[in-house]
Amino acid sequence: MARVNLYISNEVHEKINMIVEKRRQEGARDKDISLSGTASMLLELGLRVYDAQMERKESAFNQTEFNKLLLECVVKTQSTVAKILGIESLSPHVSGNPKFEYASMVDDIREKVSVEMDRFFPKNDDE
């Protein structure tokens, strides 16, 4: 195990001491808990967090590209479904049924979407 001397602020020293004292109050023995061991544990934890952040930065994931691709797929799907609804509304099997008129279907879809969107993104009174 390597030995390292480092300087920390008084505030950090106090916080580490508070952790040690709390652990002792919880029943840890003096040989089980120490300032050095606690500081080492916190340093290791900090290094894990640092490594995780560096991995995230190096990740090939690009949020902007993902959003662009997702929006493109949504727009294509919306356009395709609109065409299919238009074709279906002209079918002789549903002609004369107001439930399957194109304008009625569009209004029904918009209403259902609005209800679902409000469920996840409630409107504020400020808007």
Curated annotation (Swiss-Prot):
Keywords: Conjugation, Cytoplasm, DNA-binding, Plasmid, Transcription, Transcription regulation. It is found in: Cytoplasm. It comes from the Bacteria. InterPro entries: IHF-like_DNA-bd_dom_sf, TraM_DNA-bd, TRelaxosome_TraM. GO terms for molecular function: DNA binding. Its main location: cytoplasm. Pfam families: Tra_M. SUPFAM superfamilies: IHF-like DNA-binding proteins, TraM-like. The keyword Transport does not apply. One of its GO terms (cellular component) is cytoplasm. Belongs to the relaxosome TraM family. Conjugative DNA transfer (CDT) is the unidirectional transfer of ssDNA plasmid from a donor to a recipient cell. It is the central mechanism by which antibiotic resistance and virulence factors are propagated in bacterial populations. Part of the relaxosome, which facilitates a site- and strand-specific cut in the origin of transfer by TraI, at the nic site. Probably autoregulates its own expression. Plasmid specificity is conferred by the TraD-TraM pair. Homotetramer. 2 homotetramers cooperatively bind to DNA although they do not contact each other; cooperativity is achieved by DNA kinking and unwinding. Part of the relaxosome, a complex composed of plasmid encoded TraI, TraM, TraY and host-encoded IHF which binds to the F plasmid origin of transfer (oriT) in a site- and sequence-specific manner. Interacts with TraD. Also interacts with TraY. This is Relaxosome protein TraM. It comes from Escherichia coli.
